[in-house]
């Protein structure tokens, strides 16, 4: 085995990985964009999850409808008093674009990119299932702000039905927290018992907005629904699956979510409750819903009750999400190599805690990973050197047994055994390294911490491409130099051509890769050059290598 052939193998495996990821995201036809002229609300009935009737918001159009803003240090929400939905959510600590003041908007009521968090009470006496339409709550203020010295801000909204039952819907925002408390307090002042059922759902436009579409050369991040249940810790439920069949699952605890690159919104019911999950694609509209219903709540006459829930609206912060609901941190999707990617992300975070620079942390992680893999690298080059020394004897065997492939194979195996050479010794280390690289690829791609994170000089955002393409060019140059360092006995013209163009192909690919990933590959190449130089000097002393 030759190091050049290993480079070809790396390239083919990596390109195949990218093509497979892109095919997975593109294989299903995308629906045509639909302009939504009027928002309509779907609420689940108490009972079967598949039956989600439509309730028009215009049914209660005469009510005095208002928008309320509430801000913490990390969130700015807009609440609609009709129904008490969250129709806008700005993430104050995350900007829309690097270097700009405008905050990133995760939830929005814009018709062409609708994405809202809805909740209410259905059931026999639920205000959201009444014939007159969803309730319009009253609030004391139109603006709420987390003040200095406060740990939380509470927004209470009240509505009283015709029987005198008082429903208070509260939103609780805590300092530094993206988990929103959405609670109902029910004061049954009537003479009859009341039965209600809480639901929370997320509604989103199915068609991906233009600004969220990935580049063709970079594997696209998942955008769609997901849930967690007793059977599945983390299960994606794509928009296409919602079209084929409504989600209908009953489980203890769990959560439902809408995912996109770096950010997630998720309803997390009480872990001890038995909840019903559902989904629905709205007929005639480019919109999908995923949500849950809590158990029925009975409130006797003259009694009070409270229903609580959590709603996460924010970046994919694993440590914080894990505290909100079990397995919610798995929405940071590292794919099937998660068991490698998670420790790599943890190490990256530890390094960043010391140096306070994500680019330097990537360099430190690369040094550690390549250092750990150095014994494999050394074994790889030693095996290849021994194989080169055997080339004359192998050529003689091939010439001697050119008409008898069985005897030729037997002779080669005896030669390998005699010389203590493993013919796969140069290939196996590559097969070990590739899963690590792919896992690191996803660790860097999925880490919201790298979004708008600067490195040095012109690299002001490690999550996007190098604006001046300096890193990809340096990476290509280092790959070319590494290729020139490696001795070769390749005589096949096709393989020679492939090897000549490999650095160019990789340079072109990496032009659109995130700067953080390109930095990793560049540093890895520099380390490879250093390690290869050290190994070759050791092999020269053993007579297994000569400089060309």
Swiss-Prot record:
Q: Which Pfam family, any one, appears in the UniProt record?
A: YidC_periplas
Report one GO cellular component.
plasma membrane
Q: Its principal location?
A: membrane
Q: Where in the cell is it found?
A: Cell inner membrane
Q: How does it sit in the membrane?
A: Multi-pass membrane protein
Please provide the Gene Ontology terms (biological process) for this protein.
protein insertion into membrane; protein transport
Q: Which CDD domains match?
A: 5TM_YidC_Alb3 (cd20070), EcYidC-like_peri (cd19961)
List, alphabetically, the PANTHER family matched.
CYTOCHROME C OXIDASE ASSEMBLY PROTEIN COX18, MITOCHONDRIAL (PTHR12428:SF65), OXA1 (PTHR12428)
Tell me its family. Belongs to the OXA1/ALB3/YidC family. Type 1 subfamily.
- Its function? Required for the insertion and/or proper folding and/or complex formation of integral membrane proteins into the membrane. Involved in integration of membrane proteins that insert both dependently and independently of the Sec translocase complex, as well as at least some lipoproteins. Aids folding of multispanning membrane proteins.
Q: What is this protein called?
A: Membrane protein insertase YidC
What is the source species? Aeromonas salmonicida (strain A449)
The opening ranks of the lineage are: Bacteria, Pseudomonadati, Pseudomonadota, Gammaproteobacteria, Aeromonadales
